[in-house]
Amino acid sequence: LTKIGDASFYYCSSLEEVDLLHTKVQELGENAFAHCTSLREMKVPDSLQTLGEAVFYRCSKLVPSDINVYDNKAIVAYLRSIQ
């Protein structure tokens, strides 16, 4: 698994946590987790390189401190999503 495609989990309201640490994911597509209103924890591997627009849009329970990251990319994507 190297990519989570565009809108893969769009409006998946029952999704509470995602752990990709044991994958080689390099890309999270546009709106991949948008409107996942129960998502509270997101763990990404250091292989992550690309984040599409609005990856975490309207993920109201997900806050930057809940994101386990090895670089700042997930936090930047989150901050762009909530604007």
Residue ranges and their predicted role:
Residues 5-10, 29-32, 52-55:
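Consensus positions within tandem repeat domains that build extended binding/scaffold surfaces
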